[in-house]
Curated annotation (Swiss-Prot):
Top EC group: hydrolase
Gene from which the chain derives: mutS2
The Smr domain, residue ranges: 694-769
Family to which the UniProt record says this protein belongs: Belongs to the DNA mismatch repair MutS family. MutS2 subfamily.
Functional summary from the UniProt entry: Endonuclease that is involved in the suppression of homologous recombination and thus may have a key role in the control of bacterial genetic diversity.
Top-level taxon in the UniProt lineage: Bacteria
Residues engaged in binding ATP: G335, G336, N337, A338, G339, G340, K341, T342
Keyword Nucleotide-binding (UniProt): yes
GO molecular function, one term: ribosomal large subunit binding
InterPro entries in the cross-refs: DNA_mismatch_repair_MutS_C, DNA_mismatch_repair_MutS_core, DNA_mismatch_repair_MutS_sf, MSSS, MutS, MutS2, P-loop_NTPase, Smr_dom
GO biological process: mismatch repair; negative regulation of DNA recombination; rescue of stalled ribosome
Listed name of the protein: Endonuclease MutS2
Subunit structure: Homodimer. Binds to stalled ribosomes, contacting rRNA.
The species this protein was found in: Maridesulfovibrio salexigens (strain ATCC 14822 / DSM 2638 / NCIMB 8403 / VKM B-1763)
Length: 769
């Protein structure tokens, strides 16, 4: 996108704020390099990565610590003979250690099914050989370990042994010669890999030896006694051997890094990328931002939008609801000076650029943005005295420069175009520009003070008007938008607010009256109505949110209580069944307890109803009815003349119900119920569906009995009195297993094979307690 337009929107300032949340300089540089993407898939994938990253941090509390920049290290390795020193290798192993810790923490993504984090992890191939080698050779302070090689171990052992010999000789010399008064300090030090004594300068001629150096003050000289010369020569040889061996080890470790260069660089990039993600999460917390998905061809629907650079300021900023449906391409904003028009336009452009760059934006969840591949901005005073360019000329030049580049994939921000010339001609040019934008399908947000352009916004198809509101009593801006209306410029009120002389204001008002341009009273009234409407809408939204919250809580409470009751009844039924199977209670007592447990679901009282029950003769097959006890609608599918009962289909559940519990339903409900049952009759019911009729055909006996057991639990909880079990004829083995199950179940009052016309010995009808 055009850098100049992003600069006008203050996009670089947002990147600078974002980079301040990074823990590394490399992460900060990566933030500063972010730019808008033009592919909806990439933008939405980045948004999803952010949301899943938020969930990861919320669940684990993981925080990435600081780590050093390694770009220079990788650049240094490009030359084949360069060898990394211990400090560079230590920085690398520490960074790789952090990357491994992060990698292990992110592995929770597989269990949580965070797909974008899994993709993030899959992109890293771990430099195991390099990491292991560095851990083996470097200690926790970054020094090369003695155990890095046998040769180094032996050399350092010799150095330590020689050091002990030197120390003993020096102590014996000091005490034997009684020269402690000649020394500045009673210790031995090292200069140029040689052990020396800190001798007071005025005593240097009294002892035999070599002076190697002097202190800054000149009061101390570093003196090597003659008895240490041979030992020091040996020490220098050992130190040289140590340096040679250390160089071999560093060369070896550098070779490991080179052999896994790509993996090391990828692990570092992995850490930098997560640093950027963490910065986005922290930024979102600071300004209350969310990730926004973009939809090609969608309209603008930004709820509670706030300018990100103002969102964290003291006192915050009033949120804006920015709306532009798909059938409208241009929003023209009018209203008072210093009323927030420019802030509104900047907010639209800046939030769009942020969203396209994968940066969370300060809006409410559920906000939607269309996709744009280009954003052009004309805003502010662009005059140049050096180039002899006025404000108006600069605007004209800018539009001329970008005009041929704008199409349906362009977002155009236009602030007070034509304001630097004759109002009539400026308004005409502005209308012509908007006409051209509409023809090219360009989406535009514009601000104006021109009355002609305000009228144009109200009457032109594809264009929408909006006004920034002001307080009717104080004339101060409210920084909120009212749609489908225009606003007054209230220039005189703004002048009065800023201390403009009253005498001049009075004359200005007289001139307005003389010119017939004083439409202020009408516009003020429109503003009052708009403010009132916005308050009413806010109150309605508040009440709606409160009611929805209350409803959700009640539904949640009801569901908890329902599950508790069902679980309790099921537990009671299982307890009764176990008591009966253990022989602790008889069949009749078990049946009584099951009946009592089942009655707790619906209670003893039947719901009151004004519906008059049918007589048995009034009921016809196919007739819609109302189950008075349950207040549920159904359709009659069968009648039992002997028991004076009716089989009713209620939403796919078929059950036998006494005729005196059925009544008529309203005409509209009848038609709807007949339609539903007719549709269901045309469709084959899926096998295994847990209703009051179960089909066990084709199943192994153990599987069938397990399903039948669960089916019984459901039937008892629903309060069923009749069951139909389809087991088929076949060899009769499944039927025998079903009957054995029924014989052992205390909830069964009796059972028999169905009549031939309803399945015969292929189905068993069961009567429950």
């Amino acid at each position: 996108m055009e850098p100049r337009s992003l600069q006008l929107l203050e996009f670089p300032k947002v990147l600078n704020v974002l980079s301040g949340h990074c823990v590394s300089t490399s992460g900060a540089e990566a933030c500063l390099a972010l730019s808008p993407m033009d592919d909806a898939g990439s933008i939405n994938s980045t948004a999803q990565f952010f949301r899943q990253g938020q969930n990861f941090v919320k669940e684990t509390g993981f925080r990435l610590g600081t780590f050093p920049p390694l770009e220079g290290l990788f650049q240094y390795l490009v030359k084949p003979n360069n060898v990394l020193d211990a400090d560079a290798l230590y920085a690398l192993v520490q960074t790789l250690g952090q990357a491994r810790t992060l990698k292990e923490a992110l592995e929770i993504a597989e269990k949580r099914e965070w797909d974008t984090i899994l993709e993030f992890l899959e992109g890293v191939s771990w430099p195991e050989k390099t990491f292991s080698g560095l851990k083996r050779c470097l200690d926790q302070d970054g020094n090369i370990k003695d155990e890095s090689s046998p040769e180094l171990y032996d050399i350092r052992q010799s150095i330590r042994s020689l050091h002990q010999r030197c120390s003993k000789k020096v102590r014996d010399f000091i005490h034997g010669e009684d020269i402690s008064r000649f020394l500045q300090d009673d210790f031995m030090t090292i200069t140029n890999d040689r052990y020396v004594l800190p001798l007071k300068t005025n005593f240097k001629g009294r002892l035999q030896g070599i002076v190697h150096d002097y202190s800054n003050t000149g009061e101390t000289c570093y003196f090597e006694p003659m008895f240490l010369v041979e030992l020091n020569n040996s020490m220098q040889e050992l130190k040289q051997q140590e340096r040679t061996e250390e160089l071999k080890i560093l060369t070896y470790l550098t070779g490991l890094v080179r052999s896994e260069y790509d993996q090391c660089e990828a692990a570092y990039g992995f850490l930098v990328e997560y640093d950027v993600l963490q910065a986005k999460i922290n930024f979102a917390d600071a300004v209350k931002a969310v990730a926004v998905d973009v939809q090609s061809g969608a309209g603008f629907d930004l709820r509670g939008a706030r300018h990100p650079l103002l969102a964290s300021a003291v006192g915050g900023v009033n949120p804006l609801n920015i709306e532009l449906p798909t059938d409208q391409k241009v929003l023209i904003v009018s209203g008072g000076n210093a009323g927030g028009k420019t802030v509104c336009l900047k907010t639209v452009g800046l939030l769009s650029a942020m969203a396209f760059s994968g940066i969370p934006v300060p809006v409410e969840k559920g906000s939607v943005l269309p996709l744009f591949k280009e954003i052009f901005v004309i805003m502010g005073d662009e005059q140049s005295l050096e180039e002899n360019v006025s404000t108006f000329s600069a605007q004209i030049q800018s539009i001329s420069r970008i005009w041929d580049s704008m199409d349906s994939s362009t977002l155009f921000i236009l602030d007070e175009f034509g304001s630097g010339t004759d109002p009539a001609q400026g308004a005409a040019l502005a209308q012509a520009v908007v006409d051209g934008l509409l023809e090219n399908g360009v989406t535009c947000f514009a601000a104006t003070h021109f009355p002609a352009l305000k009228t144009y916004a109200l009457v032109t198809e594809g264009v929408r008007a909006a006004s920034v509101l002001f307080d009717p009593s104080t004339k101060k801006p409210l920084f909120s938008l009212a749609y489908d209306q225009v606003g007054a410029s209230i220039a005189l009120d703004v002048a009065r607010e800023h201390g403009f002389p009253e005498s001049l204001l009075a004359k200005a008002e007289q001139y307005l009256l003389m010119e017939g341009s004083d439409s202020g009273s009408v516009m003020n009234r429109l503003n009052e109505l708009a403010v009132s409407r916005e308050k009413e809408l806010e109150e309605m939204d508040r009440i709606k949110a409160k009611l929805e919250s209350k409803r959700a809580k009640l539904e949640e409470k009801f569901e908890r209580e329902r599950l508790t009751v069902l679980a309790d009844v099921k537990k009671q039924a299982q307890s009764v069944l176990k008591e009966w199977q253990d022989g602790k209670i008889g069949r009749k007592q078990a049946l009584k307890k099951l009946s009592e447990a089942r009655s707790t679901i619906g209670g003893d009282e039947k719901p009151k109803s004004d519906v008059k029950p049918f007589s048995f003769d009034d009921i016809k097959v196919g007739k819609p009815i109302l189950n008075i006890s349950w207040n549920r609608k159904g359709v009659v599918i069968e009648k039992d003349e002997r028991k004076k009962r009716v089989k009713v289909d209620m939403d796919g559940v078929a059950m036998w119900i006494p005729a005196d519990q059925l009544g008529p339903v309203g005409k509209k409900a009848v038609q709807e119920k007949v339609r539903q049952v007719t549709e269901k009759a045309d469709k084959k019911a899926p096998k295994g569906e847990m209703t009051l009729k179960i089909d066990l055909r084709g199943k192994r006996a153990d599987v069938a009995i397990s399903e039948l057991d669960r089916f019984f639990d459901q039937a008892l909880l629903r309060g069923a009195t009749e069951l139909e079990i389809v087991h088929g004829r076949g060899t009769g083995a499944l039927r025998r297993e079903v009957h054995i199950f029924l014989d052992d179940n205390p909830a069964v009052a009796g059972y028999s094979l169905a009549p031939e016309d309803r399945g015969g010995d292929g189905m068993t009808e069961v009567e429950l307690v």
